[in-house]
Amino acid sequence: MFKFKKNFLVGLSAALMSISLFSATASAASTDYWQNWTDGGGIVNAVNGSGGNYSVNWSNTGNFVVGKGWTTGSPFRTINYNAGVWAPNGNGYLTLYGWTRSPLIEYYVVDSWGTYRPTGTYKGTVKSDGGTYDIYTTTRYNAPSIDGDRTTFTQYWSVRQSKRPTGSNATITFTNHVNAWKSHGMNLGSNWAYQVMATEGYQSSGSSNVTVW
């Protein structure tokens, strides 16, 4: 979920996914999950492209999450993507995003953002894929999640110290983040829910075009 200076939940999108709000479709050999959720505010035009491609144009939105990835996440997955367009005007993340259960954890690996860079309780750093990421944790109480509207869960964050350049192929070696989190006592759950490379935004405008494999 988003953690901005103002109290709102951009992750509400993912949190509210509960079955009816998200759709999964077989879209490529390497990706099988298409996520498209909006709270109804503003205009969000999302396109489920061929293969692992998706695009989204948004204007004066509330909260939305659009992305492609996998129905079942993995701690061992290497995510490749190309953000040919990444142009947020306001709050937004370009991020690997997903959930685990047992325990219930919401996690982010944020490669770029708009006007706000997320933070939390600082735990350390991890070097991966040509960049250094700050590690944070946050906790949500009585908040929406994949398990209901009023749950308590922890969020794990790896946030790149500087925005990652876009427009060329990029890699997120997720295992590096998982191992770094473990070293700080941040253990993910044993039951993996979806895992997507997402465009997430709140009260903003912009456009993105991302291919995931």
Curated annotation (Swiss-Prot):
Would the keyword Flavoprotein turn up in this protein's UniProt record? no
What Enzyme Commission number(s) apply to this enzyme? 3.2.1.8
Record-linked SUPFAM superfamilies: Concanavalin A-like lectins/glucanases
Gene Ontology MF term list: endo-1,4-beta-xylanase activity
Q: Which UniProt keywords apply?
A: Carbohydrate metabolism, Glycosidase, Hydrolase, Polysaccharide degradation, Signal, Xylan degradation
**Which reaction(s) are listed as its catalytic activity?**
Endohydrolysis of (1->4)-beta-D-xylosidic linkages in xylans
State the InterPro entries in the record: ConA-like_dom_sf (IPR013320), GH11/12 (IPR013319), GH11_AS_1 (IPR018208), GH11_AS_2 (IPR033119), GH11_dom (IPR033123), Glyco_hydro_11 (IPR001137)
Give the residues annotated as active site.
Answer: 106 (nucleophile), 200 (proton donor)
- Outline the extent of the GH11 domain: 29-213
Its pathway? Glycan degradation; xylan degradation
An example GO BP is: xylan catabolic process
Extent of the signal sequence? 1-28
PANTHER family linked to this entry: ENDO-1,4-BETA-XYLANASE A-RELATED
Q: In which family does this protein belong, per the annotation?
A: Belongs to the glycosyl hydrolase 11 (cellulase G) family.
Please report the name of this protein according to its UniProt entry: Endo-1,4-beta-xylanase
